[in-house]
């Protein structure tokens, strides 16, 4: 699997991230580092504890990582969660929004794991 195929499997914006990082090897390097970021685990922990400010900060961080790496669907889901927490008032939609964010996160993590296990562009 190439890094382009990895991005295609998640509907990622490979061309957009290439415009920032310039080389497929750089895209691969930063993509492979993404699972080590703790933004999603921090978000989930804060969400489960009902901690609004930490949840906002973690969601905002996840959103930034996702947009910079071209993970479009994860970016959209994290953006919704970020806005949910922004003003400190959480609606009854948060459970469904978190489920969607987690599903998009897992999709990205699984694609990266598949890429890491079967790289053809290393």
Show the residue positions of the predicted features:
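Short, structured coil/loop segments at alpha-helix boundaries
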Residues: 1, 22-24, 71-75, 91
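Non-catalytic signal-transmission and effector/linker regions of two-component phosphorelay proteins
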Residues: 1-5, 9, 120-122
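Short secondary-structure boundary micro-motifs
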Residues: 1-4, 28-30, 50, 67
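Alpha-helix N-cap/helix-start motif at coil-to-helix transitions, marked by capping-box chemistry
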Residues: 8, 33-34, 72-75
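Long, amphipathic alpha-helical coiled-coil segments characteristic
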Residues: 11-61, 91-120
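Short, well-ordered alpha-helical segments
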Residues: 39, 51, 55-58, 66-86
């Amino acid at each position: 699997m190439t890094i382009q195929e990895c991005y295609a499997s998640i509907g990622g914006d490979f061309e957009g991230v290439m415009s920032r990082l310039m080389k497929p090897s750089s895209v691969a390097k930063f993509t492979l580092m993404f699972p080590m970021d703790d933004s999603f685990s921090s978000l989930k922990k804060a969400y489960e504890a009902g901690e609004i400010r930490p949840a906002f900060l973690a969601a905002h961080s996840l959103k930034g990582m996702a947009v910079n790496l071209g993970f479009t669907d994860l970016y959209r889901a994290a953006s919704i969660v970020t806005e949910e927490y922004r003003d400190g008032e959480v609606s009854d939609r948060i459970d469904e929004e978190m489920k969607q964010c987690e599903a998009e996160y897992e999709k990205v993590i699984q694609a990266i794991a598949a890429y890491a296990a079967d790289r053809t562009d290393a």
